[in-house]
Amino acid sequence: MGDTTVRWSDQADDVIRGDLTVAAAYVTPAGGVVVAGVAPCGLGDRDRGTLGFTTSLGLGKKLERIVRDPHVALAYHARDHGFSTSPAYVLAQGIASVDLEPSPARLQEFGPQVVRYLGELKQGPVWDRLLREYYAERVFVDVDVARVVTWPDLGASGEPDVAGAGGPAPAPPQDPPKGGTRPRVDVARLVGQLSAQPHRLLAWRGADGFPVVVPVAVAGHDTSGFRVVAPPGLLPAGGRRAGFLAHSYRPQLVGLATRMLTGWLDVADDGAAVYAPHTSKGFMAPPRKNLLLVSNGLMAKFGYWRSSRSGAAERLRALAAER
């Protein structure tokens, strides 16, 4: 049997090694997509054809969905405060596996990468207690890459280079949700929130099951939703569930501001696209590093406590063991 490892280009590897944050997309049971910002800290091995990121064990819902349907995508979409100067937009798609109990050796090996991207690890009696769950109760999401698509610019325009499996046909339209497709949140207020975030990404499930994530611009709104603009040919015609991410960040992810949406995307035959948001949630991280770490530590503690108390952590382990 021949080698099926996907090996991406030098340009894509430079982006993957350099970006401070990446948009991670996963599929929902209803056929939608959720897209969230994560810190990959340079995780990736081109020789093995793998990428990855870490997250908290307290985020059980996200992890459970990835375990149930491991089709994921990672969109390397911004050079802010990273180590790459490439103008390319890189979309990697693959099958994820979740390492729920990484070995101490793996966590220790990961430490220097965290320092490079996110700054020195805090240590000392108070910090050790505060950040125990944030530092130690981490899980790794490893992605066996099936395809890497590289566009020549961050707007994803121009002819892309594809490494791995060829791109599938456009995804067919989906049936609308029972609750209807119209907006369920205040569109005008939401567009005001999005306008403050320079990075905006739209995601949906492709015909082969992998999420597709592309950069978009927001161009006006009305009672039906807000209009999104992408390079010609990127958005599939028809209606479908879709996720949306808008965010900004400072060096080492201090002052991170993010807003995540789920909703309905409708693309007309002429390419005009309207997004009707159904859910919206966001947060703004503290603008100072120590305050950010305190916030992260407390959220990790609460998430881990909630996951343990509800039995979500054990259910997740049992589900992962079945796969």
Roles of regions detected by a PLM:
Residues 2-4, 83-189, 229-323:
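Charged, gly/pro-rich active-site loop segments
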Residues 18-28, 72-76, 198-205, 243-245:
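A short, Trp-centered hydrophobic/proline-enriched beta-strand micro-motif
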